[in-house]
């Protein structure tokens, strides 16, 4: 079978790739020196920027860049992720905890020289409260706000309708009022036409070309101190092999989302350090619950059989997560259970032995029989319409793990009598938002405070109408879940709140619309002859890319031996191609296995 042939190839990939990458490194050594001796830190990325507007962006690459451009009221400490000052130096609740007063840092300026004041924060939040388009990305943080005012340049007051536990973790970029008040339509403004973009974070965005590069320069007046590199460049590589080759040649400083084969090959490379740390993401299989809008209108074309909870549980019962971790992730992941990764121990939940949907294909078959989806004479499960069931799984065309997992699902579910069609696209957003899928590979990065990733499964996150775009991830709308969400948001006692969050995870698990298969590690690499030191988050066994803060790129110290990567190609928007020798040597099957994960999920 194709699947088994693919598996055998993957078991040989690490040795073959190691030899190929080593050969390419020997054949094409390159100095890591820019023409003008600027210290340039170049980060290879594969995920496209969805928007440079912090009011619209949801993808990881975009939100990571926004953390560099704009200050938030608070930040997360890189050691243990507790709340630390950001734009606000302190925050104090009233006795009833319905009014929060923030002291705004005095003496700081926007990159155009104008002072940063509490009025900027007040305007940002009020805009989100009064314009649904401005609430697209982060509206859940302000949905409980009653009133926001700025009595003085250094005082921000937020009044709440009900207690809200996230007041020290409002992950909302504060923007300059004098710039953004000129925007007429927040749904269409992507903040990508005029440069430099005015901000107050550690970096100033000075250049951007879609699917080519994002260029940032140090904010010399940043209150924590200016970054030490002269330039930070996010350079786009659609192909993971090209990014790895560029790292070897010194054309980039950092590459993330490495495949196990790439990580293994790079371990022995001179001047390259591989970082393999527990990740902050989950990798899941989302099931279409019947796409709907907040006004009650139904849309999309999800298979009706998936509305039966027994069917959803049977499908997940036929997923061998141990095999996925061992064969697809090759040990660089942990088996999935609850919604929140084990890295966040306070909120990590796992099902009891009686609740767990363990791998049991025989039991899955019996469950489908009980649900009325029995096999016909050809061994195919038949739906209520009398037709054989064939599920479409939406996957990312640039993601080899989606494809590899999809092949396993094809084999496992075929044994159940269920067909699978992998619908692998460069752009999964359009069919997803339209509800035109049966199942989909899904994943999100989780923040130290999990409120946001919890909020995207509430009824309030649904689009207003089928023509609108909501904050929902998968159109889930469950009253029991919503009730628990409201309870956790209003609970200030940390232990009690964690217990409620775990009940929410239990509810999601039982519903079967969000089946977590794995928690992938953050596997990444950087050149030590370009980067002398860099902060991971958490500092012990943490990741570099996609942090809950700006710590990595802000803290990075240039290596004394080099001047950073050569950014000459990015200045003209040219994307470096893959090393020709590697293309010629790597066959189609090996090439597929070599490719790294091209995205941390497009919807992240």
Predicted regions and their residues:
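Extracytoplasmic/periplasmic ligand-capture domains
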Residues: 2-11, 105-136, 148, 202-328, ...
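C-terminal segment of classical bacterial N-terminal signal peptides
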Residues: 23-32
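Extracytoplasmic
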Residues: 36-40, 47, 68, 86-88, ...
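N-terminal lobe/hinge region of extracytoplasmic solute-binding protein
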Residues: 44-95, 126, 198
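Short, solvent-exposed loop/turn elements at domain surfaces
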Residues: 50-56, 81-84, 166-169, 214-215, ...
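Short Gly/Pro-enriched turn/cap motifs at secondary-structure boundaries
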Residues: 63-64, 80-83, 192-198, 204-209, ...
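Surface-exposed binding/hinge segments that line
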Residues: 96, 103, 137-183
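Long beta-strand-rich cores associated with HINT superfamily self-processing modules
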Residues: 526-565
């Amino acid at each position: 079978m194709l699947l088994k042939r693919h598996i055998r190839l993957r078991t040989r990939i690490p040795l073959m790739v190691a030899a190929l990458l080593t050969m390419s490194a020997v054949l094409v050594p390159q100095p890591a020196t820019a023409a003008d001796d600027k210290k340039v830190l170049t980060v290879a990325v594969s995920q496209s920027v969805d928007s440079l507007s912090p009011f619209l962006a949801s993808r990881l690459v975009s939100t990571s860049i926004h953390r560099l451009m704009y200050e938030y009221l608070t930040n997360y400490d890189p050691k243990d992720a507790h709340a630390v000052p950001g734009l606000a130096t302190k925050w104090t609740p009233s006795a009833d905890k319905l009014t929060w007063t923030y002291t705004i840092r005095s003496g700081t300026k926007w990159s155009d020289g104008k002072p940063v004041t509490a009025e900027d924060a007040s305007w940002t939040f009020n805009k989100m409260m009064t314009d649904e388009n401005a609430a697209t990305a982060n509206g859940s943080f302000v949905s409980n706000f009653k009133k926001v005012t700025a009595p003085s340049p250094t005082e921000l007051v937020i009044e709440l309708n009900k207690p809200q536990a996230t007041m020290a973790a409002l992950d909302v970029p504060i923007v300059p009022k004098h710039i953004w008040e000129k925007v007429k339509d927040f749904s269409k403004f992507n903040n990508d036409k005029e440069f430099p973009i005015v901000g107050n974070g550690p970096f100033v965005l000075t250049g951007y070309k879609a699917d080519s590069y994002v260029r940032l320069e140090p904010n010399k007046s940043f209150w924590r101190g200016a970054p030490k590199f002269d330039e930070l460049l996010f350079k786009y590589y659609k192909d993971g092999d090209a990014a790895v080759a560029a790292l070897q040649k010194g054309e980039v400083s950092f590459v993330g989302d490495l495949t196990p084969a790439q990580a293994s090959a790079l371990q022995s490379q001179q001047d390259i350090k591989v970082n393999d740390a527990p990740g902050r993401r989950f990798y899941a299989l989302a099931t279409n619950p019947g796409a709907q809008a907040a006004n009650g209108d139904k849309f999309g074309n999800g298979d009706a059989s998936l509305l039966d909870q027994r069917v959803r549980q049977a499908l997940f019962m036929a997923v061998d997560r141990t095999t996925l971790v061992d064969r697809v992730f090759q040990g660089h992941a942990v088996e999935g259970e609850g919604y929140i990764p084990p890295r966040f121990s306070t909120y990590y939940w796992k099902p009891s032995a009686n609740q767990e949907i363990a791998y049991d294909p025989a039991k899955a078959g019996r469950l489908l029989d009980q649900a009325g989806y029995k096999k016909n004479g050809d061994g195919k499960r038949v739906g209520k319409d009398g037709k054989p069931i064939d599920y479409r799984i939406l996957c990312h065309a640039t993601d080899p793990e989606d494809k590899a997992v999809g092949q396993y699902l094809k084999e496992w579910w075929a044994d159940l009598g269920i067909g699978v069609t992998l619908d692998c696209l460069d752009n999964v957003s359009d069919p997803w938002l339209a509800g035109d899928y049966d199942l989909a590979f899904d994943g999100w990065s989780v923040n130290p405070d999990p409120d946001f990733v919890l909020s995207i499964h509430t009824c309030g996150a649904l689009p207003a109408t089928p023509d609108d775009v909501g904050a929902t991830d998968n159109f889930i709308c469950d009253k029991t879940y919503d009730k628990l969400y409201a309870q956790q948001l209003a609970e200030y006692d940390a232990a009690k709140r964690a217990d409620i969050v775990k009940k929410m995870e239990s509810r999601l698990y039982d519903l079967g619309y969000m089946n977590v298969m794995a928690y992938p590690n953050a596997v990444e690499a950087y050149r030590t002859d370009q980067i002398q030191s860099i902060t991971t988050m958490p500092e012990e066994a943490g990741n570099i890319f996609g942090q809950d803060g700006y710590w990595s790129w802000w803290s990075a110290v240039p290596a004394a031996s080099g001047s950073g990567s050569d950014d000459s190609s990015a200045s003209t928007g040219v994307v470096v191609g893959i090393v020709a020798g590697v293309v010629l040597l790597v066959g189609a099957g090996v090439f597929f296995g070599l490719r790294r994960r091209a995205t941390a999920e497009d919807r992240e």
